[in-house]
Amino acid sequence: MAALIPQKMFDEQLAAMDIENFAQATIRQVGAVGGALEKNSGTEFLHLEMGVPGLPPETVGVEAEQQALAQGRASIYPSITGIAPLKSEASRFVKAFLDIDVAPEGCIPTVGSMQGGFCLFQICSQCDPKKDTILFIDPGFPVQRQQVRILGIKHESFDIYDFRAEKLGPKLESYLKQGNVAAIIYSNPNNPAWICLTESELRTIGELATKYDTIVLEDLAYMGMDFRKELGHPFKAPFQATAARYTDNYVLMISGSKIFSYAGQRIAIAAISDKLRNRFYPALKERYGIGRFAESYALTFLYAASSGASHSAQYALAAMFKAAADGKLDFVAHTREYAPVSYTHLTLPTILL
């Protein structure tokens, strides 16, 4: 089948945007390339780069945020560690849909998982002087690799495609046994590849993270969107697969952007395991005066980055978490629009970015 977009046009567009390696481009760069090629070629593209199929935001979140604004929350700085309703409802949401116990104290709001991850890369790379490298299990979000470059943090990566099932353990251990990996990051499910790690693979990641004392950063942007399973029923199996069942060294990044279509308000949580939350790191204490992981994450890194997440948006996220855990908001059903999009992506010879 002939290419619908001439290679020359594609190459010229990359050159015009100063992109040397398209595989390493950020999501925003990919979107810009797609937009330009659409305009120049007159060919319609299937856009998956932003992962937003145009769904409306959840009404319960909008109403809760409107109420918070009407009550004057916009004039008040939020607690850097999060408002109490969000912390408690986030903890309950994690239990309802992952069957994992995380104390409210470990659920900390961030300005989207973008900021949450940015600050996690910083703190994880500073916990132990011997561990200064972030390991990416690809495919992931390209901008996260951009973040570690901006921060000057060392990083390694490998593609999960060639190391599924029993091949994952030896490959992952080949990096961890070097002793310099501070954290492992991956997305599950991943967009636009729509690769879902299996329970067995997540067990491998969790057990090796414990063995080598490495922190797992699990990005759950598309939580519940493995539509082959009947996920999304609160407090009932099957639950979202997670490495958190197999290690205490984890942070779950849960964003409102995709699961609640609340991307514009930039609100998420970092759910830190109880053990990691209270773990004391001498290097953090020496550098910042705060040695416990979660306390340092919030009061040092997040505080310096934004002085807190949007006050009113925290009320929105709390309300959506509560409605979902109460069984009144079926966010998995509401996001099922992703299913035909991902199916089209994986089965049709469509031009997509």
Where do the language-model regions lie?
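N-terminal small-domain helix-loop-helix segment of the aminotransferase-like
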Residues: 4-10, 17-115, 321
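Short, solvent-exposed loop/turn segments at secondary-structure junctions
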Residues: 51-55, 83, 114, 141-142, ...
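Short aromatic-enriched loop/helix-cap "lid" or pocket-rim segments at secondary-structure transitions
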Residues: 58-61, 227-231, 263-266
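Conserved core segment of the aminotransferase class I/II
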Residues: 245-336
